[in-house]
Design a protein with these regions (language model features):
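Flexible helix-coil transition and linker loops at the boundaries of alpha-helical arrays
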Residues: 7-12, 45-57, 92-96, 118, ...
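Terminal, low-structured helical/coil segments at or just beyond the last alpha-helical repeat
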Residues: 114-162
Length: 162
């Protein structure tokens, strides 16, 4: 069988709840963020209502990916909430960093510094995050700003269906 055929068989063997999450992941990969968020919300609702035994890893990864979708739409408050919930489920360095980056982007430097202190972020991780934030903030604007804005607007409408 082809690898595609095997992938489809493996997909079909997954529980319905896992297939829904995979669909959300696929939509994020293809920049269909609003649809992905809706699928993730349905998946979380199904997980709660059906008391599925998928565990905190599964729930945390849904919240993380939903946070990424919201962040891609520049809806940082929603992203922040999702990343916080993801970190509560996952308790990983990566999930903590995503949450702290969202704090920085939505609430600013002071809130970020305060949260790093509250969460007792170690010095090495803090330096690494500060460096990544500095790099992320060094954006070069395109030479033809009008053309770039038109392209970005077109891309946003394509990704949101608006």
């Amino acid at each position: 069988k082809s690898s595609l055929g095997l992938g489809i068989v493996r997909f079909e063997e997954q529980p319905e709840i896992v297939r829904k999450k995979i669909k959300g992941d696929y939509l994020v990969d293809h920049e269909k963020y609003i649809n992905a968020i809706q699928v993730y919300q349905e998946t979380l609702k199904d997980t709660e209502e059906n008391e599925t035994n998928m565990g905190s890893q599964f729930t945390g990864s849904i919240y993380n990916n939903m946070g990424c979708a919201y962040a891609s739409l520049f809806q940082m408050n929603e992203a922040l909430t999702c990343f916080q919930k993801a970190n509560e489920e996952l308790h990983t360095k990566a999930s903590l960093k995503s949450w702290l980056f969202a704090v920085y982007m939505s609430k600013g430097q002071d809130a970020y510094e305060q949260m790093c202190t509250e969460r007792k972020v170690d010095a090495e991780t803090k330096r690494e995050m500060d460096r990544q934030i500095t790099e992320a903030m060094q954006v070069e604007l395109p030479h033809d700003l009008d053309e770039a804005l038109t392209a970005w607007t077109r891309e946003y409408h394509k990704n949101t269906g608006l």
